[in-house]
């Protein structure tokens, strides 16, 4: 086992100054890219341009029938009685399309024993895999990695691509190496391992995955480190690697969730972060702690062993702290950038929903516009605010997620830990629409 930690640090362009008065943030001048909100400009992957999800955008968040998920029935089926299942992704090619192996559909999920309380599952997480002939009747195959081989004390979400005859698996090494069950240990690094997939008429299995490497760590400049984050009150992120090849530059990249570099609380909201705010909207001072972004790393060779950190593709400074599980759909020359987030991670003075958010631009690094004007694609209904989460949009327009906590008729709740019904989302230009729902866990 070894660690390749080649990280090239690039500072983003300087942030404009602002003044703070009576707990309300007043922005000063805009950044040099402030005029580029037309959604037509694109840049090279290593450019320092970062698109913005602004407070003005987030103030437009509204729910209606086109973006509200159907209620999850409390009588949902459970795909396995062995483990809780949450963040899930399919086996893909580098072009992001799902793929099969010898007629088998394969998915990967964060799992934990069902003997563990549902709320504690994150601290026991391992990546498990499932396989199916019909893309919905899933058989649990066990852990993806051999015991004791992965970095960290638990495995958090990532992505898995079939490249030639090898399986490249990317994941979040969460916690210190061999750190045990410690919810206070928030260290997160991006990791990778290579294996092979095998199948016969009865089952799917994997070999390899014994040599893991850390491929990226937060640099403190573009991406906040754990130590920097500990000066603030908000949950920290450097996780969720999503691998793909950009069809334009032909390079292999990773998207991931991060926070803007610098000590928590030192960030100063710019006019560009705030956008064209309506009259009377005041920005609470504590908004400066909310600095979510969608990060980018680029492979420096064909082996996918060495990576360079690039500036973030999109920031949500003073808007939201979490831009989890970022992923990409490329369709009709447009790049659809998706992420998931929670109601509780929106900055003070803003409110959203647990659900799926998205943006569209003309290239990988470009002037992303929020879909539907606000970025909301799918949110949980008001009477079931935590019913499902961790949405993943596939190139075919299908959206899978897991069932979280569902209200019951007697006023109680039922924990899910299993896949929800797959939803169908229509994508057209910068608009989306909920178009239907399919079977539970249908991931073709």
Language model regions located:
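Secretory targeting and sorting signals
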Residues: 1-32
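Carbohydrate-active catalytic/glycan-binding domains of CAZyme proteins
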Residues: 33-444
